[in-house]
Amino acid sequence: LKPYNMGVDLMSISSHKIHGPKGAGALFVKKGTRLVQHTFGGLQEGKIRPGTEPTPAIAGFGAAAAAIPDYRESLLHATQLRDYLVSRLKTIDGIRINSPADALPYITNISVEGIPSEVMLNYLSNMGIYVSSGSACSKGHKSRVLKAMNLSEDIINTALRISISVFTTKQELDYLVEGIVSARQTMKRLK
């Protein structure tokens, strides 16, 4: 990743987004960009943020960064898997794809008609499948993004967030689709 070739002034990168440990990140600052310090203390982290650097987390971040494949390969892999997942989901009655077609392929948001997100999360987790109902930073709150898309409360309340990474396989996505189909069949029987 070469932010200086991308025309950006500032870029933040979170370790946990590339399978590294939580608590570490990186900040690219274009030469000549002025930052205003908001917290004061030591001289760590370029005088931008005081406090002891989490050395083990930083080392883990470095190892994770070294392990990721070329960005283009990663993007192609994720795009192919997202397209495969969406094509499979479109064959299931009661599934709505909420993500725009031109969204980055790493997150796919869907709604499963008639099954609240929390019920679906529990059902899938009992099968060893882990998805979420929203972003980690807004846990417990309805998605601001889905609200901004003017989606109905029913769609928002049944939304699932599916993550795809360089380690995701077609077999895992097939198992996810089987889990969603199974959940829908189970809920129909219970009604």
Region spans (language model):
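Pyridoxal 5′-phosphate
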Residues: 1-191
